[in-house]
Amino acid sequence: MHPRPHLITLSILAGMYILTQVIIVPALPDLQSQFKTDYKTIQFTISGYLLAVALVNFIAGPLSDRYGRRTIMLIFFFIFMLGSVGCFLSETLSTFLFFRILQASSAAGLVLSRAIIGDISSEKETVKMLGLLSIAMGIAPSLAPLVGGIINDFFGAKQIFLFLSIVSIFLLFIIFYDLKETNFKQTEDIFAQIKSYPILLISMNFWLPTITFSLSFSIFGVFFIGGPFIASKVFNLTPTVTGFYLACPSLGYILGNVLVSRIANIVSTKRLMFWGSLLLTSGPICSLIFCISFFHPLCFYLPVLLMTFG
């Protein structure tokens, strides 16, 4: 029988990369001022981080198949700790961006949590547990901007990375004590999984949902990169209030997941994707109409909730 880590442990690890992504978003204007750079450059703390997350997603799974889930999880979260401490201590923009990229190693938490669930659960249990992980991933970006905004207002932008450093030490502790090895069929060929990728690349069953998901998820990226600038320069909002408004897309994501989990058995996937795409399209149109008619932050931020709900 496989040793079972607590589900709360897997949920925290799975949500950590997106929390790390968005917790600094309300502080971007202040980080821009501290490093004396332009907003386009400081945005790389989000876009560069996401590129590194994609790389971690690519390599973490095969590495854990070869060397074990627990070992790779510990290594990647140790790198995450180094990145968080490095960001806090950085005096120059280039050093800061380097350590920010290292923080993307936290994405291993999502990849390996899913793999661990596959190791320890039956097919039916796996679906249920992955649904709970999705909720955790929705909660993290809901709370993170607000937490980041409060820390920025009361202690300063770089103190966010001190907070993440403390969290990373806690995560290493719970990985060490709660996460036992679950992969007892470790492969000798580290490239075994990667060799199957060409099969996926020629499959329309892979590309259609992947493109749909990628375009949908890009809403988060665009919103979290441009949202703080609009909040600060257009609406003159404080980081704490900005964090509150930036929670809107995550709330839509949670509500959408809850609804889909309840109607997935009675509504076809194709129909769900159609209505979801319709909501995605209607969001920006509503935002444009509202912003032309009224000058208020809600006119810009609330329609994003509609988009992420879809």
State the predicted function of each range.
Residues 79, 83-86, 94-102, 298-306:
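Paired small-residue
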Residues 271-310:
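C-terminal transmembrane helical hairpin of 12-TM major facilitator-type secondary transporters
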Residues 55-93:
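Conserved MFS/SLC helix-loop-helix module at the cytosolic interface between two early adjacent transmembrane helices
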Residues 99-136:
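Cytoplasmic helix-loop-helix junction between adjacent transmembrane helices
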Residues 36, 68, 89-95, 122, ...:
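Helix-breaking motifs and short loop linkers at transmembrane-helix boundaries and internal kinks
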Residues 95, 131-177:
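Helix-loop-helix hairpin linking two adjacent transmembrane segments in secondary transporters
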Residues 5-39, 60, 223-228:
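Extracytoplasmic
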Residues 180-210:
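Juxtamembrane intracellular "pre-TM" segments in multi-pass secondary transporters
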